Amino acid sequence: MANIKQTIDELLTLDGAMCAAIVDTASGMTLGSGGSGLDLEIAAAGNTEVMRSKYKTMAALGLNDVIDDILITLGKQYHIIRPSKVKEGVFIYYVLDKARSNLALARRKAQDADANMKF
C-alpha cells in the first residue's frame, strides 16, 4: 500500500506524465500533488466541478452506475480524472503529454495507483 506522496511519485514515472494530484471532491482541494506544467490548485478546483456535474447528470438520468474514469483529450495533453475506489470522495487527476504517453498505459497506471493507495 502506498501513501499519497508515493502514489503521486508512482504516477509520474510513466513516460509523458506531466503532473498528478489526489483531490478531495467535497472541497476541491488537493490532498497531494506533484509534477509541473499546470497550476494544480486551479486544475483540482475546476475538475471537481467536472466530477460534480457528471454525478448530477448521472442522477438526473437515473443511471445506477459508477464512473471508472473521465478522459479529457486536448490538442497536446490527456487529462484523466479517476474517482477512487479505495476512498469515497477522492479522485486522481492525472495529466500527460499526448505526444509522449500511451493512453492505455496511463489509464492502467491510474487504476493501479488507486488500488494501492492508502489514507
Give the positions of each predicted feature.
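Non-catalytic interaction/Regulatory regions outside core domains
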Residues: 1-119
